[in-house]
Design a protein with these regions (language model features):
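Bacterial N-terminal signal peptides that target proteins for export
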Residues: 1-12
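Active-site helix/loop module of the DD-peptidase/beta-lactamase fold
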Residues: 102-123, 143-154
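Structured C-terminal helix/loop/strand segments within mature extracytoplasmic catalytic/sensor domains
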Residues: 29-57, 70, 78, 164, ...
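Mid-domain, small-residue-enriched loop/turn segments at the edges of structured enzyme/sensor domains
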Residues: 28-29, 72, 128-184
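Bacterial N-terminal signal peptides
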Residues: 11-22
Length: 346
């Protein structure tokens, strides 16, 4: 009677352990339904719809600086850049510092250039920015100097590029990508962008990743241009830009776009890493050298199936499986000990 009860308890424990093992998830993290099975265009379409934004009122750009994945909405339409122009403007000067053509102490309008860099990027000083491009020979000369930073195809530039302060989203992404991937050419510029506007524009909401950015703001009568461009330090840094034209809630839109693009980048980075990290089957053992004496025939070994490749995402779940399996083994041993002890005492 007692032995029967012990056997029933033993069976119940086995069932419980099997249920625990089956409950272990196949993946350590759930897929994000914002991105799963969606293209970048579809992700952005949902974003614009949720924010009530007319697609004609914005221009967007995105690039992963590691993989080169790149996307645009209205990428080749010229928009008022406002103070975002101070990024390529200072690229001219910082590259001159790097080459030895000038120093950080060279004075511009009474300021050493190091201070002028800070004031134009962190404080967005328009008067000083004007003096910087006038020192280069005037507006048109300055615009000609920044062409290599903005495009690989100078012939594609619209005449408005040289007449006024207009850029496209594609040009700004090209500029930021160059700044990030060849940052040693432009000493100090990204450091100043990291300090700019810690609570506004792309930073209007707290972000999960550090950003280095430069906003652009201009209001003409009832028309309002509020823009931002940034390097976002996700696992694989991305560069993004958003131009807006008289949006009702521009700061929310900017911050939410920044968050969305960072999350999009992380999602696809992790997905790609999982796909690339497949565990390959163990290599076949090297054949043993032939024996010198005639060997006694031995039966051929029974072939075993090679292990199936396992994705990194499944590998991430292995610690959970191992923990449950260890607990299962301990519980099984305990149940077995109790069971057989009962049999001996019977």
């Amino acid at each position: 009677m007692i032995a029967g009860k012990r056997a029933a308890g033993f069976a119940a424990a086995l069932c419980l352990l099997l249920a625990l093992l089956c409950a272990v998830p196949a993946h350590a993290a759930d897929d994000d339904d914002r991105f799963q099975g969606k293209t970048w265009d579809e992700v952005v379409e949902v974003f614009l719809s949720e924010h009530g934004i007319d697609p004609e009122k914005v221009a967007l750009g995105y690039r992963n600086t590691v993989t080169g994945e790149e996307h645009f909405l209205n990428g080749d339409i010229y928009h008022m850049a406002a103070s975002m122009q101070k990024v390529p403007l200072n690229m001219v000067y910082t590259e001159r510092v790097r080459s030895g053509e000038m120093t950080l102490n060279e004075r511009i309008d009474g300021y050493p250039y190091a201070k002028a860099l800070e004031l134009t990027i962190v404080n967005s000083d328009n008067d000083l920015a004007y003096r910087l491009w006038m020192k280069l020979g005037g507006f048109r000369e300055y615009r000609s100097m920044i062409v290599p930073y903005m495009t690989d195809d100078p012939d594609s530039l619209d005449p408005i590029f040289f007449r006024d302060n207009y850029f496209t989203a594609r040009q700004m992404i090209h500029c930021l990508n160059l700044l990030q991937t060849e940052s040693e050419r432009f000493p100090g510029l990204i450091d100043m962008m990291r300090l700019a506007e810690p609570k506004n524009y792309f930073n209007y909401h707290e972000q999960s990743y550090e950003i280095a950015h430069k906003y652009g703001y201009l209001k003409v009568l009832t028309t309002q241009y509020i823009n931002d461009c940034a390097i976002v330090y996700t696992d694989e840094p991305i560069v993004i830009v958003m131009f807006t034209l008289s949006l009702p809630k521009p700061y929310d839109a900017l911050a939410d776009y920044c968050t969305l693009m960072a999350d999009y980048a992380q999602y696809h980075t992790e997905l790609r890493r999982a796909e690339e990290a497949q565990v390959t089957p163990s290599p076949s053992p090297s054949p043993s050298p032939a024996p010198t004496a005639a060997p006694t025939p031995t039966p051929a070994p029974t072939p075993t199936a090679s292990p199936a490749p396992v994705l990194e995402r499944d590998a991430e779940a292995l610690p959970v499986v191992a923990a449950v399996a260890a607990a299962a083994a301990i519980l099984l041993l305990a149940c077995a000990a109790v069971f057989f002890r009962g049999r001996r005492h019977r």
